[in-house]
């Protein structure tokens, strides 16, 4: 009977009605091809999509859908429908999200003004000194407002209906680089309010009764230029933390208002009971913040932030959830106070069963840094031993003075580097070469020493020959010690404007009772308990661990006899218990990132086309695919930590691959050090 059916289908396919259908489809394809060629340049594809939608031609719509995804470099896939058992609300999951950062809109930007006058005023001295409509890469000017508006319009027309959430990592105001127009706190708040309103308008569900109802969740974080003075941010509650809660009231869950007032950090469930994003106020760890000395004293903002961080991670683990970390300043040694860097790195390492990765901005260079959790723990233990010796008078005061001097110099250097980020880029190739020669080289050396086939035999030989020598480790052990810090390219034309779409695994998501989270303490109860803990930590010298409702076991360090036992540091995690398995960052599973697509706007080409054309600017401005993670030199099958370490090794040993990687790091702007 099936065979008969097939025969009948083949016969019917030659009948007149089917021929008409075939001709219609072919005609549609030809028409679409012509529109697609034009649309690739002028972005008319969405108009044609509406035309087909009105016709109701399902076959043509499917074809269009596939071509549309191909045009955008995205993996075509059917969305998954999920339902929140508590609210009863259904939504589509696409398995993609957007990371966008460092927009830096400048209302003083004037088209045709002098680049030498930061594009604010003045008559250009030469053709190259003219400020173009959409901004100029490597000029040192901030983003014209139209660049921000056209970027968001392009996202709306091309990506909004294909993503699940947006990670937006700060710096939504111009740099303070014009003495004629010094920034004020009011201006900073006003522009952040404007950008937040635009994000709300773009991604909200349009529900007037519930302004927190979003089709696409938005998770903002605070940039170092979003505060006044820039870089300086005190532990809350302050005017600034309260003002940002007002500005972000639609993004920050209401039950977290008190914790946000204190830390300007919060948690968002982007898939209820399954997946969360943490917005981390990295300014409390930032060495350029003059109010940050270290992360060891309870009164330090960094200590309080890490305390919050630890309790939230443990709660997410207890609920069986996975989490992305996000923030403005990347958590690398260059940016953070040493104790803050070591502790933050250690937390990400010891919660590798739930942390998927970290997304950051600030540096305007598209690249990644592997951070070593095992090394961070060693560094912390060494610092604690040294601190104990100082307290016992075993070290001289001169060493203490030298440490303080180094700290002051670190603050000064960091502040200078941050100031230069608002100027024309310089020495960025030198920085990237440092990344290659330190981080990537070390990874390559370690990978070279790992030989899975012979490692067990080598271990036995080493044990017999000399027990004091280091034992070789397996590839799995090597990979486990690392986490990946992803640093995004920026919208501001330090180079070319850019952003990234991440794709992740949603294959195993099903619409069932697993989405119910009623067996866990409601989030408002958790955060109420956490608020009490945070307040007590500032008032008491030592908190009685028996009073902690949100349990985190703390590491204990033994002391010699007749010496005072060292108090536990609650901002240091214990080692990850063996009962927990590696999470999505290490082993392909639900929520593992699978690939990404990097988009950029070629400003030189766009401005030139605008100059030579009578077409409206909105029909010329566009983002293009710069590269994807599965093409050379990336050639990544997935975005696990192991894949990133392999890439780091290839980039170190393969010069052509490295050169291409650096070209993309600067958003194909052609940047070179002077």
UniProtKB/Swiss-Prot annotation:
Matches recorded under SUPFAM superfamilies: Metallo-dependent phosphatases
Keywords tagged on the record: Cytoplasm, Glycoprotein, Hydrolase, Isopeptide bond, Membrane, Metal-binding, Signal-anchor, Transmembrane, Transmembrane helix, Ubl conjugation, Vacuole, Zymogen
E.C. number: 3.6.1.10, 3.6.1.-, 3.6.1.11
Co-factor remark: Divalent metal cations. Exopolyphosphatase activity is predominant in the presence of Co(2+), while endopolyphosphatase activity is predominant in the presence of Mg(2+). Co(2+) is more effective than Mn(2+) for dATP phosphohydrolase activity. The yeast vacuole plays an important role in Zn(2+) storing and sequestering. Therefore, the changes in Zn(2+) concentration may regulate the enzyme's activity.
Cofactor(s) required for function per UniProt: Mn(2+); Mg(2+); Co(2+); Zn(2+)
Post-translational modification: Processing by proteases in the vacuole is required for activation. Ubiquitinated. Ubiquitination mediates sorting into internal vesicles in late endosomes. TUL1 and RSP5 are required for ubiquitination. Other cytoplasmic Lys residues than Lys-6 may also be ubiquitinated.
Subunit structure: Homotetramer. Interacts with PPN2.
Descriptive protein name: Endopolyphosphatase
UniProt source species: Saccharomyces cerevisiae (strain ATCC 204508 / S288c)
